[in-house]
A protein has these predicted regions:
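Start-transfer (signal-anchor) and selected internal transmembrane alpha helices
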Residues: 1-40, 244-245, 452, 466-476, ...
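Active-site-proximal, structured, solvent-exposed surfaces of multi-pass membrane proteins
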Residues: 5, 10, 14-16, 665-795
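Membrane-embedded helix bundles of polyisoprenyl
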Residues: 27, 131-144, 150-231, 244-264, ...
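Active-site lumenal/periplasmic loops and adjacent helix-entry segments of GT-C-fold
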Residues: 37-145, 150-182, 206-210, 293, ...
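Periplasmic/ER-lumenal interhelical loops and adjacent helix-loop junctions
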Residues: 53-57, 61-76, 106, 241-242, ...
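Soluble catalytic regions of membrane-associated enzymes that act on cell-envelope
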Residues: 113, 471-713, 717-725, 730-734
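Contiguous transmembrane helix-bundle modules in multi-pass membrane proteins
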Residues: 194-195, 214, 345-506, 752-795
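Membrane-interface helix-loop-helix junctions at transmembrane boundaries of multi-pass membrane enzymes
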Residues: 234-243, 333-356
């Protein structure tokens, strides 16, 4: 007799008993229902909190227009179009800036079928689609491991509405990964068990294109998955099978490398990598609470991404730390664990648990990124769902005792609510260390209620032929209720600060048409993130992790923090002149605060469309020349607080570049490195303005400038340096000099000069060749196996 939980030939799509489309429909309907109350409250423009509001809505809307050419015009100099985004921080290559977020997502490309203005209202329908696709993929994977196909439907719902997925609605594009991953694992199983060819290569390519960052983790997980299954002899491995699998792996990577090569070259310039000298940090987390949080995240429903119920230490917020299965938690998986010996699923989950508890192993899922994340948990969650349905289907498995045990573990967390605490300052005593008692009660209540209902259903209906269907209905009802509460806690927790989000975003579209013509940057003061994207303007306030890497060196050199956002303080007034900021935008309610903080360089321009606009009297058009320079070594010896002032006076060259280009400028005297006051800044702006380009035009592949010089000199542009740029002076290619620790300059001769900077992602030619070549090979490879299969049938 075949063991429960082992691989078997699945039903094919279209057969009478197959329930693929039923699963897709159930997942879509459930997702639509729990989003519906918020969709109605928000009038169709669903906004949540944090990253969803600031990034995801803005990115989807902006990129829809950018791809369609709705932003800056095409360059008249080149045939290269739609490669450079001015609205992304100080300007960034669009492929590298958005390949982590959406550039390779099939859901984003599907959204291009709709007008740009619809996108804020399509965020929920797109999420519903993602949940539906996730359910379909999980069903395809799980049906191999069950006897009754209804259990595959149940397992798919457990995966689709896991704590990980619901939590990551906050990040939106993480749900894309959850949706597509099951197809990758299904195709691997098809290759291992059924010798089915080409599908694995296809899904490798799709997942790689969708998100290169998550794909790194998928490679690690697939290696664990393959080795664990091989170690338990779940399939027969031959040299031919291994060779074909390796070939399809490489072929899939080749097909999916269109975004990979440019992304890798960009990441190599990004300082957010692991510190290889961390010693104990390889093996242990610095806070005990981190371990407790990891363990609890596998058994209890998740907190809101930006609110913790219990933990006061460790890296907890925004980490996607949840492996919770709706209703049953790990009860079914633990039951399976106790019932099976030498099972591959146990080894996979056990290995993942070890990886979760060891920092260096956990970071392996993110190419040794130094920041802690748990954004790979969706992969073991799929295996946990398989273990759960296998335990439920096997009538000999004890389901009740694991459920009771996990219930007691949940109840044990009440200790955090009643432990006595003495205030170190007053000496008074209180009870509990909870950070958000209300959320904790909701999370604990759902966890215990789910297990109680799970035990009741198992005791009452386990012997019934419709047990799986009844449990599926309970899981979906539970998922609906918990998702409404979970999203509600996150959404209404920021309702006061985000209630005017829609108004500000839509008003920005009106203001876009009322700002003066010209190509300049803007700044904002105490309004919502990424308003510059709605204005289609480069803005100093920007929230996004993957802007041009040189920005991550330019800002810190000035003492401006740059991690996942750019937000130079208003007190750093000299940055506004250096970066060619002409207008600052705030709301009428914040005008008094702005007036108290701002320097004398702002004059009131007008109030319109719900905004108050100020003009920078020290505005310097983009593209200007200097009289002085100083070396990077000298620059690093100056005080960070006044470096922006210094950059208005002198160009900073590396020691090597100073030896080449220093002859065109005068070395800045030591005495002039200290006279860095507002009054001297105004004079420096006046001098730079006198040397500025007469024409500066932004386009969607870079920019064009025209300038007249009295002598041969470097012309500076406050555009982030990127290896993808090529500069042309009067039609001739010229070298680009990296200056000011991250910006650009180019040497121009005396007289009139026409300057064009054209951007193509570094490595794009190689990536295109790999992708096109891979597709050709894959088509031939697939055609061969289709032909062979038909010939075999005829024979």
């Amino acid at each position: 007799m075949e063991r429960s939980g082992t691989a078997r030939q699945p039903q094919l799509l279209g057969q009478k008993k197959d329930k693929f489309w039923l699963t897709v429909g159930l997942c879509a309907l459930t997702a639509a229902l729990f989003f519906l109350p918020f969709y109605i409250i928000d009038g169709g423009f669903f906004h949540y909190a944090g990253d969803f509001n600031s990034q995801q809505i803005s990115f989807y809307r902006y990129m829809n227009g950018f791809i369609k050419g709705a932003g800056y015009p095409d360059s008249a100099f080149t045939s290269v179009h739609n490669t450079f985004s001015w609205a992304t921080d100080l300007g960034s290559g669009v492929m590298n800036a958005y390949s982590f977020y959406l550039y390779g997502s099939p859901f984003f490309w599907f959204s291009l079928l709709f007008p740009q203005g619809w996108l804020p209202y399509l965020m929920v329908p797109l999420l519903v689609l993602k949940f539906a696709v996730a359910g379909g993929g999980a069903y395809l994977y799980l049906r191999r491991y069950v006897k009754n196909i209804d259990y595959a439907v149940l397992g798919a719902c457990l995966y689709t509405f896991s704590g990980f997925t619901v939590y990551n609605v906050f990040f939106n594009h993480f749900v894309d990964v959850v949706a597509l991953f099951p197809y990758l694992l299904w195709s691997l199983d098809e290759a291992l068990y059924n010798d089915r060819r080409s599908w694995f290569a296809f899904w490798v390519a799709v997942n790689l294109v969708n998100n290169y960052f998550f794909f790194i983790g998928q490679v690690v997980f697939l290696a664990i998955y393959f080795i664990c299954k091989l170690s338990t002899r779940d399939f027969r491995l031959t040299a031919k099978k291994f060779g074909l699998l390796a070939f399809e792996s490489l072929l899939g990577v080749a097909m999916g490398s269109i975004l990979l090569v440019p992304a890798v070259l960009s990441i190599l310039q990004n300082p957010r990598t692991i510190d290889l000298s961390s010693g104990w940090g390889f093996l242990t987390y610095s806070k005990v609470q981190q371990y407790l949080a990891i363990l609890v995240s596998w058994i209890m429903p998740p907190d809101s991404p930006y609110l913790t119920s219990i933990w006061s230490e460790g890296v907890i917020k925004w980490t996607s730390m949840s492996a919770y299965l709706p209703l049953c938690s790990l009860a079914g998986a633990v039951a399976y664990w106790k019932a099976k010996c030498g099972d591959s699923k146990k080894r996979i989950v056990g290995t993942c648990a070890v990886f979760a508890l060891v920092p260096i192993l956990n970071s392996a899922f993110y190419a040794l990124n130094s920041s802690y994340y748990a954004r790979w948990y969706y992969m073991p969650v799929l295996v946990l769902a398989a273990m759960t349905v296998n335990a439920l289907e096997d009538h000999n498995t004890d389901l009740d005792s694991p459920a009771r045990g996990i219930s007691w573990l949940m109840i044990a967390t009440v200790a955090f609510a009643v432990v006595p605490v003495q205030d170190s300052d007053t000496g008074s005593w209180s009870f509990g260390v909870l950070k958000n008692p209300g959320q904790y009660c909701a999370v604990l209540g759902f966890g215990l209620l789910g297990l109680l209902l799970y035990r009741y259903l198992c005791q009452k209906w386990r012997g019934d032929s419709r047990f799986a269907q009844r449990l599926t209905a309970a899981v979906l009802a539970f998922a609906f209720l918990f998702s409404v509460v979970h999203i509600g806690i996150g959404k209404f927790g920021q309702w006061y600060t985000d209630s005017d989000l829609v108004k500000q975003d839509t008003n920005a579209l009106l203001l876009k048409n009322d700002l003066s013509e010209g190509d300049y940057r803007v700044d904002t003061y105490k309004i919502h993130d990424n308003i510059g994207m709605w204005l289609d303007k480069s803005c100093l306030q920007y929230f996004g992790s993957t802007a041009a890497p040189s920005i991550l060196s330019f800002y810190p050199a000035l003492g401006v923090k740059r991690d996942v956002r750019s937000e130079p303080e208003l007190s750093n007034y000299a940055l506004r002149g250096l970066l060619s900021v002409e207008y600052l935008i705030t709301t009428p309610e914040k005008q008094t605060d702005f007036g108290n903080e701002a320097d004398d360089g702002w004059e009131y321009a007008f109030a319109k469309d719900g905004y108050a606009v100020y003009r920078n009297t020290n505005y310097v058009p983009m593209g200007f020349a200097y009289d002085y320079y100083l070396t990077q070594t000298e620059y690093e010896e100056t005080a960070k607080a006044t470096r922006a002032n210094l950059l208005m006076r002198a160009l900073v060259l590396t020691d090597e570049d100073a030896a080449v280009y220093g002859k065109y400028l005068t070395h800045l005297p030591e005495g002039r490195r200290e006279e860095l006051y507002y009054e001297s800044y105004v004079q420096d702006c006046r001098e730079r303005r006198a040397t500025a380009a007469s024409v500066f035009q932004m386009n969607n592949s870079g920019f064009h400038a025209e300038i007249t010089l009295e002598k041969e000199n470097l012309v500076f542009f406050s555009v982030p340096y990127d290896d993808g740029f090529t500069a042309y002076i009067n039609g001739q290619e010229a070298d680009i000099v990296e200056v000011d620790e991250g910006l650009m300059a180019v040497l121009c001769p005396a007289g009139e000069n026409s300057i064009d900077f054209v951007y193509q992602p570094d490595g794009i030619r190689l990536s295109r060749a790999l992708t096109l070549g891979g597709i050709v090979v894959w088509l031939a490879y697939t055609a061969y196996f289709v032909w062979r299969k038909r010939r075999t049938k005829r024979a």
